[in-house]
Amino acid sequence: MILRTERLLIRPFKENDINDLYDIYSDTKVCKYLLHDVWNEDNKLKEFQQKLKYNKLEEGKINLACVLDKKVIGDISICYTEMKETVEIGYTFNSRYSGKGYAYESVKTVVKYLFKNYGIHRIIANLDSRNLSSAKLCERIGMRKEAHFIKDYWNKGEWTDSYIYGMLASDL
């Protein structure tokens, strides 16, 4: 899957993306609401290899790099769920590029592409309820909040709430 927007290239990760991705995942602000800890020099290669491993949605999961002027500024992950024709989408972006619409532009493009080209019926996003930026992005691309689970994830030493956002192909 290779997509282009007005400003971005969206493609599977390549070997030479490791340092750009490390810039994203070594930032404590970025990882605050994620289910994993920040990357460090000891785990960066192992973590990055997991990103490289999934490069075809047909195999169940894909990790996509969002590239601006040859620099990876974001990561979009898509995986099939156990429900027929349903995928979950997740996204993480470099905090230095926030507020410029890159996340909206890339996630919206990927969502439209999935519905149009993969016969997807439903896309969901599961996020930490404190991650207001992520919730706003879901709403901006046309997702609706379908659930609020109370203290359902044990993450970084505390129970946290989560939101489930969803949209159907017919919502486009």
PLM-predicted stretches and their roles:
Residues 70, 78-80, 103-104, 111, ...:
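Short, contiguous, well-ordered secondary-structure segments
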Residues 13, 126, 144-162:
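Conserved catalytic-core motifs of GNAT/GCN5-like acyltransferases
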Residues 1-96, 158-172:
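GNAT-family acyltransferases
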Residues 117-126:
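Conserved GNAT acetyl-CoA-binding A-motif
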Residues 99-116, 132-140:
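Conserved acetyl-CoA-binding loop-helix of GNAT-fold acetyltransferases
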